[in-house]
Amino acid sequence: MWVGVISLFPEMFTSITNFGVTGQAVKKGLLSIDTWNPRDFTEDKHRTVDDRPYGGGPGMLMMVQPLRDAIHTAKKSAKGKAKVIYLSPQGRKLDQAGVEELAQNESLILICGRYEGVDERIIQQEVDEEWSIGDFVLTGGELPAMTLVDAVVRFVPGVLGDFASAEEDSFANGLLDCPHYTRPDVLDGHAVPKVLMSGNHKDISRWRLKQSLGRTWLRRPELLGNLALTDDQEFLLAEFIREYKASII
């Protein structure tokens, strides 16, 4: 996958190109990230990248000419046709389905806004989609862009040692993930559930599914409303709820 980033602070992206799963993907040649700074496309000696909004009001907007030139340069460098994304609070909220959808693209261009945002005509003429990581305001689009890349690259074949890790994570099937345990067997008097040490893979699979359903019911019940549970899943969820209610009496 190729990702082009338009940012006034391209140095921030070394945190994902040099470290962790994304860094390993870069080293393996499975992910390539190029950055363009609108400041490098300015035409004045002060390298100005902001401008006043028409109609007045507080704050500044990103200047059109340097931003548009940076976008055009990124498009020419893309591996094939790239989907252009503007990270924006007004965009579609990123979720697991959206991540998997974006992972189908060979190339993405991510525009990281600053100040009060960008000229609406840039969005209309240059941007394919707007995406948001949540209903809150940040100082720029760099962190949302890095979040998007980190989530999407997990679905690039070969990035994860075990692709099942991506398929079984929280939200991959619309549910929260089940609890996980490692050594020691007993920690401060709390033991690992016996079923996980039984070696019976069928029982372990059912336990994990039940815990995943139950944890979703406890913590994010609205997610269950989006799912069509099978009879077996309904049975496991009902069993979890009975056991949970009995444990708090």
Swiss-Prot record:
Q: Which GO terms describe its biological process?
A: tRNA N1-guanine methylation
Residues that, per the record, bind S-adenosyl-L-methionine: 113, 133-138
Question: Which Enzyme Commission numbers does its entry carry?
Answer: 2.1.1.228
SUPFAM superfamilies hit by this protein: alpha/beta knot
Gene Ontology molecular function, alphabetical: tRNA (guanine(37)-N1)-methyltransferase activity
**Key word Transferase present:** yes
Query: Which compartments is it annotated to reside in?
Result: Cytoplasm
* Major location (coarse): cytoplasm
Q: Which Pfam families match?
A: tRNA_m1G_MT
Cellular compartments per GO CC: cytosol
- Gene3D superfamilies linked to this entry: 3.40.1280.10, tRNA(m1g37)methyltransferase, domain 2
Which residues does UniProt call coiled coil? none
Entry annotated with the keyword Transferase = yes
Q: Which UniProt keywords apply?
A: Cytoplasm, Methyltransferase, S-adenosyl-L-methionine, Transferase, tRNA processing
Q: What InterPro entries does the database record attribute to this sequence?
A: Alpha/beta_knot_MTases, tRNA_m1G_MeTrfase_C_sf, tRNA_m1G_MeTrfase_TrmD, tRNA_m1G_MTases_N, tRNA_MeTrfase_TRMD/TRM10
Catalysis performed (reactions): guanosine(37) in tRNA + S-adenosyl-L-methionine = N(1)-methylguanosine(37) in tRNA + S-adenosyl-L-homocysteine + H(+)
Query: What family classification does the UniProt entry report for this protein?
Result: Belongs to the RNA methyltransferase TrmD family.
Question: What is the recorded function of this protein according to its Swiss-Prot or TrEMBL entry?
Answer: Specifically methylates guanosine-37 in various tRNAs.
Q: Indicate the quaternary assembly.
A: Homodimer.
Q: What's the name of the protein?
A: tRNA (guanine-N(1)-)-methyltransferase
Supply the source organism for this entry: Photobacterium profundum (strain SS9)
